[in-house]
Amino acid sequence: MSDDITSEAQTIAVGQLRAFIERIERLEEEKKTIGDDIKEVYAELKGSGFDSKVVRTIIRLRKKEDHERQEEEAMLQLYMDALGMS
């Protein structure tokens, strides 16, 4: 009886593991599809005359809180001033 319980538990664990792996694989495929879609949008953006590098910077900055962005901009300005770049 103990062996039956162990075998059943092992079967359940294997099933759970397989389900997790399959979910991750599906999500990875979705992530790839989304990445491809984003590349297409950047290509359209570039084709319309926009600078994709600048747009990427804007997107990165928009993800930050205002105070984080202001702090980063202040540090950038400080470093540029120190190097005589402003």
From Swiss-Prot:
InterPro entries: GapR-like (IPR018753), GapR-like_DNA-bd (IPR046367). It comes from the Bacteria. GO terms for molecular function: DNA binding. Pfam families: GapR_DNA-bd. Belongs to the UPF0335 family. This is UPF0335 protein BAB1_1765. It comes from Brucella abortus (strain 2308). The lineage of its organism: Bacteria, Pseudomonadati, Pseudomonadota, Alphaproteobacteria, Hyphomicrobiales.
